[in-house]
């Protein structure tokens, strides 16, 4: 892959253990990411803020005060939540960044059709002044076991291009999935415009599903427990 792909280091599997978060910070990841608001709080309170903190799921409405206070950027796929998030960011006098998610068959999250995603992008860009549209993304290999392919990655790239044409500027990020997208990035089949991946499993365990690169260590974590 000839372009730079940034990494969001996902720490939910280790409960945002400060020692591991610090390693991620030092490794040069773009974001520290988790799906747990409680873990965002742990990192904030521990001063682990060298990198922007990312929430990698759509939040509940009741969580929005914490989402704005504790994270810098979040994945979003519902216009009602986006509008409420904007109001909360306004109350806290903050600009919160969002990545709009597109569902490409996995059914975990995201707008189901491109028209809805385009409408949401235009509303964020032009009307929701306390939100900043940072990019678009997709989640795969989760609920529906739809794996990353050149075809669905290109569909995401096409959506990004359509949004960029409508808003008149380039998006910062086109996020092409998580650990299961690593093989495409490493074997040169990832479309050029994909520039952010969210790595949890492959960063911690050195492998993901059936993909196990030789250059990644598989023994960096040891679980110790007392047997009763």
Where are these regions (language model features)?
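Active-site-adjacent beta->alpha loops and helix N-cap segments on the catalytic face
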Residues: 18, 40-43, 80-94, 145-155
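N-terminal active-site wall of soluble small-molecule enzyme domains
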Residues: 2-71, 184
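Conserved, mostly hydrophobic/aromatic
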Residues: 12, 43, 67, 78, ...
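Short, acidic/turn-prone active-site loops that include or flank metal/cofactor-
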Residues: 36-39, 57-62, 79-81, 102-104, ...
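A generic, well-ordered mixed alpha/beta core segment in the N-terminal half of proteins
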Residues: 64-107
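Acidic (Asp/Glu)-rich catalytic clusters
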Residues: 2, 22-26, 44-49, 68-69, ...
């Amino acid at each position: 892959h000839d372009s730079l792909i940034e990494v969001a280091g996902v720490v939910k599997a280790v409960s945002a253990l400060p020692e591991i978060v610090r390693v991620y910070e030092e490794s040069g990841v773009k974001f520290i990411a988790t799906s747990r608001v409680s873990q965002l709080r742990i990192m904030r309170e521990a001063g682990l803020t060298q990198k922007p903190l990312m929430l990698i799921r759509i939040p509940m409405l009741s969580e929005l005060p914490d989402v704005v206070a504790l994270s810098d950027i979040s994945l979003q796929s519902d216009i009602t939540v986006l509008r409420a998030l904007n109001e909360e960011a306004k109350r806290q006098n903050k600009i919160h960044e969002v990545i709009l998610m597109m569902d490409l068959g996995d059914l975990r999250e995201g707008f189901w059709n491109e028209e809805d995603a385009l409408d949401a992008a235009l509303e964020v860009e032009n009307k929701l002044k306390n939100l900043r549209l940072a990019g678009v993304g997709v989640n795969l290999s989760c609920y529906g076991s739809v794996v990353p392919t050149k075809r669905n990655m290109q569909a995401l790239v096409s959506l990004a291009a359509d949004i960029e044409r409508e808003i008149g500027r380039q998006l910062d990020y086109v996020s092409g999935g998580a650990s299961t997208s690593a093989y495409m990035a490493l074997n040169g089949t990832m479309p050029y415009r994909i520039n952010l991946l969210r790595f949890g499993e492959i960063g911690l365990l050195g492998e993901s599903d059936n993909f196990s690169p030789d250059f990644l260590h598989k023994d960096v974590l040891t679980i110790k427990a007392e047997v009763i």
